[in-house]
Protein backbone atom coordinates (compact mmCIF):
# COMPACT_ATOMS: atom_id res chain seq x y z
CA UNK A 1 0.00 0.00 0.00
CA UNK A 2 1.12 3.54 -0.81
CA UNK A 3 0.09 6.96 0.50
CA UNK A 4 -0.67 10.32 -1.05
CA UNK A 5 -0.27 13.47 1.05
CA UNK A 6 -1.75 16.69 -0.32
CA UNK A 7 0.78 19.52 0.11
CA UNK A 8 0.28 21.85 -2.85
CA UNK A 9 -1.98 24.59 -1.47
CA UNK A 10 -0.99 28.07 -0.29
CA UNK A 11 -2.72 28.17 3.11
CA UNK A 12 -3.90 31.77 2.77
CA UNK A 13 -5.70 31.78 6.14
CA UNK A 14 -2.30 31.36 7.76
CA UNK A 15 -0.74 34.41 6.13
CA UNK A 16 1.82 35.85 6.73
CA UNK A 17 3.53 32.66 7.98
CA UNK A 18 2.66 30.94 4.69
CA UNK A 19 3.76 33.79 2.46
CA UNK A 20 7.14 32.13 2.09
CA UNK A 21 6.61 28.48 3.13
CA UNK A 22 4.07 25.72 2.40
CA UNK A 23 1.56 25.22 5.19
CA UNK A 24 2.73 21.61 5.83
CA UNK A 25 6.19 23.01 6.66
CA UNK A 26 4.99 25.10 9.61
CA UNK A 27 6.72 23.68 12.69
CA UNK A 28 4.76 22.09 15.52
CA UNK A 29 6.92 21.27 18.57
CA UNK A 30 10.04 21.84 16.52
CA UNK A 31 9.29 19.87 13.35
CA UNK A 32 7.00 20.42 10.34
CA UNK A 33 3.36 19.36 10.34
CA UNK A 34 4.23 17.14 7.38
CA UNK A 35 6.92 15.32 9.34
CA UNK A 36 4.41 14.53 12.09
CA UNK A 37 2.06 13.05 9.45
CA UNK A 38 4.78 10.99 7.79
CA UNK A 39 5.84 9.54 11.15
CA UNK A 40 2.27 8.34 11.74
CA UNK A 41 1.99 6.44 8.43
CA UNK A 42 5.44 5.44 7.17
CA UNK A 43 5.38 1.99 8.78
CA UNK A 44 2.17 1.14 6.91
CA UNK A 45 3.23 2.05 3.38
CA UNK A 46 5.91 1.34 0.79
CA UNK A 47 5.87 4.72 -0.94
CA UNK A 48 4.70 8.19 0.10
CA UNK A 49 3.76 10.50 -2.75
CA UNK A 50 3.80 14.16 -1.80
CA UNK A 51 1.66 16.25 -4.14
CA UNK A 52 3.50 19.56 -4.11
CA UNK A 53 3.06 23.00 -5.62
CA UNK A 54 3.64 26.27 -3.79
CA UNK A 55 7.24 26.58 -2.51
CA UNK A 56 7.79 22.91 -3.34
CA UNK A 57 11.58 23.26 -3.06
CA UNK A 58 11.35 23.69 0.71
CA UNK A 59 9.53 20.37 1.07
CA UNK A 60 11.88 18.54 -1.30
CA UNK A 61 14.99 19.86 0.43
CA UNK A 62 13.77 18.97 3.93
CA UNK A 63 12.79 15.36 3.11
CA UNK A 64 15.55 14.59 0.60
CA UNK A 65 17.04 11.85 2.80
CA UNK A 66 13.80 9.83 3.10
CA UNK A 67 13.90 6.99 0.52
CA UNK A 68 10.16 6.32 0.72
CA UNK A 69 9.17 9.78 -0.50
CA UNK A 70 8.52 10.76 -4.11
CA UNK A 71 7.12 14.04 -5.42
CA UNK A 72 4.30 14.84 -7.83
CA UNK A 73 3.87 18.41 -9.04
CA UNK A 74 0.34 19.84 -9.14
CA UNK A 75 1.02 22.82 -11.37
CA UNK A 76 -2.44 24.33 -10.92
CA UNK A 77 -4.40 23.87 -7.72
CA UNK A 78 -7.67 22.58 -9.19
CA UNK A 79 -9.10 20.89 -6.12
CA UNK A 80 -8.37 18.01 -3.77
CA UNK A 81 -9.74 15.45 -6.22
CA UNK A 82 -7.48 16.80 -8.94
CA UNK A 83 -4.52 16.56 -6.54
CA UNK A 84 -5.28 12.88 -5.91
CA UNK A 85 -5.65 12.27 -9.65
CA UNK A 86 -2.12 13.51 -10.28
CA UNK A 87 -0.93 10.32 -8.55
CA UNK A 88 -3.05 7.90 -10.61
CA UNK A 89 -0.18 6.52 -12.69
CA UNK A 90 1.85 5.75 -9.57
CA UNK A 91 -0.78 3.93 -7.49
CA UNK A 92 -1.49 0.30 -8.34
CA UNK A 93 -3.44 -0.92 -5.31
CA UNK A 94 -5.38 0.37 -2.30
CA UNK A 95 -3.92 3.59 -0.92
CA UNK A 96 -4.07 6.22 1.79
CA UNK A 97 -4.81 9.90 1.25
CA UNK A 98 -4.07 12.51 3.90
CA UNK A 99 -4.46 16.25 3.96
CA UNK A 100 -1.09 17.87 4.54
CA UNK A 101 -2.37 20.33 7.14
CA UNK A 102 -3.72 18.05 9.87
CA UNK A 103 -2.08 16.76 13.01
CA UNK A 104 -3.32 13.80 15.03
CA UNK A 105 -2.32 11.29 17.70
CA UNK A 106 -4.33 8.13 16.96
CA UNK A 107 -3.12 5.11 15.04
CA UNK A 108 -4.71 4.58 11.61
CA UNK A 109 -5.08 0.82 12.16
CA UNK A 110 -8.87 0.78 12.23
CA UNK A 111 -9.47 2.47 8.89
CA UNK A 112 -7.26 -0.12 7.18
CA UNK A 113 -9.84 -2.83 7.92
CA UNK A 114 -12.27 -1.45 5.32
CA UNK A 115 -12.06 -1.19 1.54
CA UNK A 116 -12.98 2.51 1.65
CA UNK A 117 -12.92 4.44 4.90
CA UNK A 118 -12.66 7.96 6.30
CA UNK A 119 -11.29 8.92 9.71
CA UNK A 120 -13.72 11.05 11.71
CA UNK A 121 -13.26 13.42 14.63
CA UNK A 122 -15.69 14.97 17.11
CA UNK A 123 -15.35 18.76 17.25
CA UNK A 124 -17.06 21.64 19.01
CA UNK A 125 -17.98 23.57 15.86
CA UNK A 126 -18.72 20.97 13.17
CA UNK A 127 -20.45 23.55 10.96
CA UNK A 128 -16.99 24.68 9.81
CA UNK A 129 -16.20 21.27 8.29
CA UNK A 130 -17.62 18.41 6.28
CA UNK A 131 -20.05 16.73 8.69
CA UNK A 132 -20.80 13.00 8.57
CA UNK A 133 -23.89 11.00 9.50
CA UNK A 134 -23.19 7.39 10.42
CA UNK A 135 -25.56 4.48 9.98
CA UNK A 136 -25.37 0.77 10.78
CA UNK A 137 -21.94 -0.88 10.98
CA UNK A 138 -20.09 2.45 10.70
CA UNK A 139 -21.37 3.05 7.18
CA UNK A 140 -21.53 6.72 6.24
CA UNK A 141 -25.00 7.60 5.01
CA UNK A 142 -24.56 11.35 4.54
CA UNK A 143 -21.79 13.92 4.13
CA UNK A 144 -22.64 17.63 4.32
CA UNK A 145 -20.09 20.34 3.56
CA UNK A 146 -20.23 23.15 6.15
CA UNK A 147 -23.95 22.82 6.95
CA UNK A 148 -25.96 25.34 8.93
CA UNK A 149 -26.10 24.66 12.66
CA UNK A 150 -29.75 23.64 12.49
CA UNK A 151 -28.94 21.09 9.76
CA UNK A 152 -26.10 19.32 11.58
CA UNK A 153 -26.61 15.53 11.53
CA UNK A 154 -23.85 14.99 14.14
CA UNK A 155 -20.67 16.51 15.52
CA UNK A 156 -18.50 14.04 13.60
CA UNK A 157 -16.44 15.59 10.85
CA UNK A 158 -14.29 14.37 8.00
CA UNK A 159 -10.77 14.36 9.49
CA UNK A 160 -8.90 14.35 6.17
CA UNK A 161 -7.51 10.80 6.44
CA UNK A 162 -8.74 8.25 3.88
CA UNK A 163 -8.14 4.64 2.89
CA UNK A 164 -9.42 4.06 -0.65
CA UNK A 165 -9.51 1.46 -3.38
CA UNK A 166 -7.81 2.09 -6.69
CA UNK A 167 -11.14 2.40 -8.56
CA UNK A 168 -11.68 5.79 -6.87
CA UNK A 169 -9.52 7.22 -9.67
CA UNK A 170 -12.23 6.23 -12.17
CA UNK A 171 -14.84 8.05 -10.09
CA UNK A 172 -12.67 11.16 -9.89
CA UNK A 173 -12.08 11.21 -13.66
CA UNK A 174 -15.82 11.23 -14.30
CA UNK A 175 -16.75 13.97 -11.82
CA UNK A 176 -18.21 17.27 -12.96
CA UNK A 177 -16.18 20.23 -11.60
CA UNK A 178 -17.70 22.09 -8.66
CA UNK A 179 -18.99 25.67 -8.81
CA UNK A 180 -15.42 26.78 -8.09
CA UNK A 181 -14.26 24.87 -11.16
CA UNK A 182 -12.47 22.27 -9.05
CA UNK A 183 -12.51 18.49 -8.83
CA UNK A 184 -13.39 17.74 -5.22
CA UNK A 185 -12.42 14.55 -3.40
CA UNK A 186 -15.57 14.87 -1.28
CA UNK A 187 -17.70 14.51 -4.44
CA UNK A 188 -16.05 11.14 -5.05
CA UNK A 189 -16.78 10.19 -1.44
CA UNK A 190 -20.44 11.01 -2.00
CA UNK A 191 -20.50 8.58 -4.93
CA UNK A 192 -19.15 5.87 -2.62
CA UNK A 193 -21.80 6.77 -0.02
CA UNK A 194 -24.55 6.41 -2.63
CA UNK A 195 -23.34 2.86 -3.28
CA UNK A 196 -23.02 2.02 0.42
CA UNK A 197 -19.26 1.62 0.12
CA UNK A 198 -17.80 4.16 2.55
CA UNK A 199 -17.20 3.59 6.25
CA UNK A 200 -16.34 6.11 8.95
CA UNK A 201 -13.99 5.42 11.86
CA UNK A 202 -13.86 7.85 14.77
CA UNK A 203 -10.48 8.98 16.05
CA UNK A 204 -10.42 8.95 19.84
CA UNK A 205 -7.28 11.00 20.34
CA UNK A 206 -6.28 14.56 19.58
CA UNK A 207 -6.87 15.89 16.05
CA UNK A 208 -6.47 19.41 14.71
CA UNK A 209 -6.96 20.98 11.31
CA UNK A 210 -4.25 23.65 11.14
CA UNK A 211 -6.31 26.36 9.49
CA UNK A 212 -5.54 29.49 11.53
CA UNK A 213 -2.53 30.86 13.43
CA UNK A 214 -4.07 29.99 16.79
CA UNK A 215 -4.45 26.36 15.63
CA UNK A 216 -0.67 26.30 15.16
CA UNK A 217 -0.13 27.50 18.72
CA UNK A 218 -2.73 25.11 20.14
CA UNK A 219 -1.15 22.09 18.43
CA UNK A 220 2.30 23.28 19.46
CA UNK A 221 1.18 23.39 23.10
CA UNK A 222 -0.30 19.90 22.85
CA UNK A 223 2.78 18.27 21.39
CA UNK A 224 5.23 20.16 23.59
CA UNK A 225 3.52 18.62 26.58
CA UNK A 226 4.62 15.18 25.32
CA UNK A 227 8.35 15.90 25.10
CA UNK A 228 10.99 14.22 27.26
CA UNK A 229 13.81 16.36 28.62
CA UNK A 230 17.16 16.21 26.88
CA UNK A 231 19.77 18.89 27.50
CA UNK A 232 22.71 18.67 25.09
CA UNK A 233 23.60 22.35 24.76
CA UNK A 234 25.90 24.51 26.88
CA UNK A 235 24.40 25.72 30.16
CA UNK A 236 26.32 28.56 31.81
CA UNK A 237 26.25 29.73 35.46
CA UNK A 238 23.10 30.37 37.52
CA UNK A 239 20.64 29.08 34.91
CA UNK A 240 17.30 27.76 36.22
CA UNK A 241 15.65 24.97 34.20
CA UNK A 242 12.36 23.40 35.30
CA UNK A 243 9.88 21.11 33.56
CA UNK A 244 10.55 19.14 30.39
CA UNK A 245 13.05 20.98 28.22
CA UNK A 246 14.95 20.01 25.07
CA UNK A 247 18.09 22.05 24.48
CA UNK A 248 19.90 20.81 21.40
CA UNK A 249 23.65 20.53 20.94
CA UNK A 250 25.09 23.83 19.80
CA UNK A 251 22.61 25.94 21.78
CA UNK A 252 23.91 28.16 24.58
CA UNK A 253 22.02 29.32 27.68
CA UNK A 254 23.83 32.28 29.21
CA UNK A 255 23.99 33.19 32.93
CA UNK A 256 20.97 34.04 35.09
CA UNK A 257 18.42 32.89 32.50
CA UNK A 258 15.22 31.05 33.48
CA UNK A 259 13.63 28.33 31.35
CA UNK A 260 10.28 26.81 32.34
CA UNK A 261 9.24 23.79 30.28
CA UNK A 262 7.84 22.50 28.15
CA UNK A 263 10.30 24.29 25.89
CA UNK A 264 12.40 23.35 22.85
CA UNK A 265 15.55 25.31 22.03
CA UNK A 266 17.10 24.23 18.73
CA UNK A 267 20.76 24.08 17.76
CA UNK A 268 22.68 27.30 17.28
CA UNK A 269 20.33 29.32 19.47
CA UNK A 270 21.54 31.67 22.20
CA UNK A 271 19.42 32.56 25.22
CA UNK A 272 20.36 35.26 27.69
CA UNK A 273 21.95 36.52 29.75
CA UNK A 274 19.00 37.16 32.06
CA UNK A 275 16.36 35.91 29.59
CA UNK A 276 13.06 34.30 30.60
CA UNK A 277 11.69 31.48 28.41
CA UNK A 278 8.25 30.46 29.62
CA UNK A 279 6.20 27.31 28.91
CA UNK A 280 5.03 26.22 25.45
CA UNK A 281 7.80 28.04 23.60
CA UNK A 282 9.90 26.80 20.69
CA UNK A 283 13.03 28.60 19.55
CA UNK A 284 14.00 27.24 16.14
CA UNK A 285 17.58 27.05 14.84
CA UNK A 286 19.97 29.97 15.32
CA UNK A 287 17.59 32.24 17.21
CA UNK A 288 18.76 34.78 19.78
CA UNK A 289 16.77 35.88 22.82
CA UNK A 290 18.88 38.36 24.72
CA UNK A 291 19.15 40.34 27.93
CA UNK A 292 15.89 40.74 29.89
CA UNK A 293 13.69 39.49 27.05
CA UNK A 294 10.73 37.25 27.85
CA UNK A 295 9.13 34.71 25.49
CA UNK A 296 5.92 32.90 26.42
CA UNK A 297 3.83 30.36 24.51
CA UNK A 298 5.34 31.32 21.17
CA UNK A 299 7.10 29.89 18.12
CA UNK A 300 10.18 31.82 17.04
CA UNK A 301 11.40 30.70 13.62
CA UNK A 302 15.01 30.30 12.56
CA UNK A 303 17.61 33.08 12.57
CA UNK A 304 15.37 35.56 14.40
CA UNK A 305 16.86 37.94 16.97
CA UNK A 306 15.02 39.38 19.97
CA UNK A 307 18.06 40.91 21.68
CA UNK A 308 16.93 42.94 24.67
CA UNK A 309 14.09 44.19 26.88
CA UNK A 310 11.32 42.70 24.74
CA UNK A 311 8.19 40.64 25.41
CA UNK A 312 6.71 38.12 22.97
CA UNK A 313 3.61 36.24 24.13
CA UNK A 314 1.32 33.76 22.33
CA UNK A 315 2.81 34.75 19.00
CA UNK A 316 4.38 33.30 15.87
CA UNK A 317 7.46 35.17 14.70
CA UNK A 318 8.82 34.39 11.24
CA UNK A 319 12.37 33.63 10.17
CA UNK A 320 15.17 36.20 9.91
CA UNK A 321 13.38 38.86 11.96
CA UNK A 322 15.19 41.41 14.13
CA UNK A 323 13.39 43.17 16.98
CA UNK A 324 14.58 46.50 18.33
CA UNK A 325 14.87 47.16 22.05
CA UNK A 326 11.55 47.04 23.96
CA UNK A 327 9.45 45.44 21.22
CA UNK A 328 6.22 44.24 22.84
CA UNK A 329 3.42 41.92 21.65
CA UNK A 330 0.19 42.47 23.57
CA UNK A 331 -1.86 39.28 23.82
CA UNK A 332 -4.99 39.98 25.90
CA UNK A 333 -8.01 42.26 25.60
CA UNK A 334 -9.18 44.31 28.58
CA UNK A 335 -12.62 42.65 28.41
CA UNK A 336 -11.15 39.10 28.28
CA UNK A 337 -13.11 38.35 25.10
CA UNK A 338 -11.57 36.36 22.22
CA UNK A 339 -9.07 38.31 20.17
CA UNK A 340 -10.48 39.25 16.76
CA UNK A 341 -8.25 38.48 13.78
CA UNK A 342 -8.67 39.63 10.21
CA UNK A 343 -8.72 36.50 8.03
CA UNK A 344 -9.05 37.11 4.29
CA UNK A 345 -10.79 40.42 4.92
CA UNK A 346 -13.24 39.21 7.58
CA UNK A 347 -13.03 39.50 11.39
CA UNK A 348 -12.78 36.06 12.99
CA UNK A 349 -12.93 35.15 16.69
CA UNK A 350 -9.73 33.44 17.76
CA UNK A 351 -8.84 32.64 21.36
CA UNK A 352 -8.60 34.55 24.63
CA UNK A 353 -4.83 35.05 24.38
CA UNK A 354 -3.20 35.74 21.04
CA UNK A 355 -0.25 37.98 20.29
CA UNK A 356 1.17 38.96 16.91
CA UNK A 357 1.64 36.86 13.77
CA UNK A 358 4.73 38.17 12.03
CA UNK A 359 6.13 37.08 8.67
CA UNK A 360 9.72 36.50 7.65
CA UNK A 361 12.37 39.23 7.42
CA UNK A 362 10.53 41.80 9.56
CA UNK A 363 12.54 44.41 11.46
CA UNK A 364 11.31 46.67 14.24
CA UNK A 365 12.85 49.80 15.70
CA UNK A 366 12.95 50.59 19.40
CA UNK A 367 9.74 50.71 21.46
CA UNK A 368 7.41 49.09 18.93
CA UNK A 369 4.18 47.59 20.28
CA UNK A 370 1.79 45.17 18.55
CA UNK A 371 -1.85 44.92 19.65
CA UNK A 372 -3.40 41.44 20.06
CA UNK A 373 -4.02 39.51 16.86
CA UNK A 374 -2.28 41.82 14.38
CA UNK A 375 -0.46 40.32 11.39
CA UNK A 376 2.67 41.81 9.85
CA UNK A 377 3.53 40.80 6.30
CA UNK A 378 6.96 39.56 5.33
CA UNK A 379 9.86 41.88 4.46
CA UNK A 380 8.37 44.83 6.36
CA UNK A 381 10.07 47.52 8.44
CA UNK A 382 8.39 49.02 11.51
CA UNK A 383 9.97 52.27 12.67
CA UNK A 384 10.60 53.37 16.26
CA UNK A 385 7.79 54.24 18.71
CA UNK A 386 5.00 52.74 16.57
CA UNK A 387 1.84 51.20 18.05
CA UNK A 388 0.55 48.70 15.47
CA UNK A 389 -3.18 48.04 15.83
CA UNK A 390 -3.97 46.97 12.25
CA UNK A 391 -2.56 44.37 9.89
CA UNK A 392 0.39 45.45 7.76
CA UNK A 393 0.86 44.06 4.24
CA UNK A 394 4.15 42.54 3.12
CA UNK A 395 6.96 44.80 1.91
CA UNK A 396 5.68 47.76 3.95
CA UNK A 397 7.64 50.53 5.65
CA UNK A 398 5.78 51.88 8.68
CA UNK A 399 7.03 54.92 10.56
CA UNK A 400 5.66 57.64 12.81
CA UNK A 401 5.89 61.30 11.80
CA UNK A 402 6.04 63.01 15.17
CA UNK A 403 7.32 66.55 15.02
CA UNK A 404 10.24 67.27 17.29
CA UNK A 405 10.18 70.83 18.66
CA UNK A 406 13.49 72.38 19.77
CA UNK A 407 13.63 75.82 21.42
CA UNK A 408 16.10 77.75 23.49
CA UNK A 409 15.95 77.10 27.21
CA UNK A 410 14.76 80.03 29.30
CA UNK A 411 16.89 81.21 32.19
Curated annotation (Swiss-Prot):
Broad EC category: transferase
Residues holding acetyl-CoA: 384, 401
Single Gene Ontology MF annotation: glucosamine-1-phosphate N-acetyltransferase activity
Record pathway: Nucleotide-sugar biosynthesis; UDP-N-acetyl-alpha-D-glucosamine biosynthesis; N-acetyl-alpha-D-glucosamine 1-phosphate from alpha-D-glucosamine 6-phosphate (route II): step 2/2; Nucleotide-sugar biosynthesis; UDP-N-acetyl-alpha-D-glucosamine biosynthesis; UDP-N-acetyl-alpha-D-glucosamine from N-acetyl-alpha-D-glucosamine 1-phosphate: step 1/1
Single Gene Ontology BP annotation: UDP-N-acetylglucosamine biosynthetic process
Keywords: Acyltransferase, Multifunctional enzyme, Nucleotidyltransferase, Repeat, Transferase
SUPFAM superfamilies, per database record: Nucleotide-diphospho-sugar transferases, Trimeric LpxA-like enzymes
Protein's UniProt name: Bifunctional protein GlmU
Species name: Methanococcus maripaludis (strain C7 / ATCC BAA-1331)
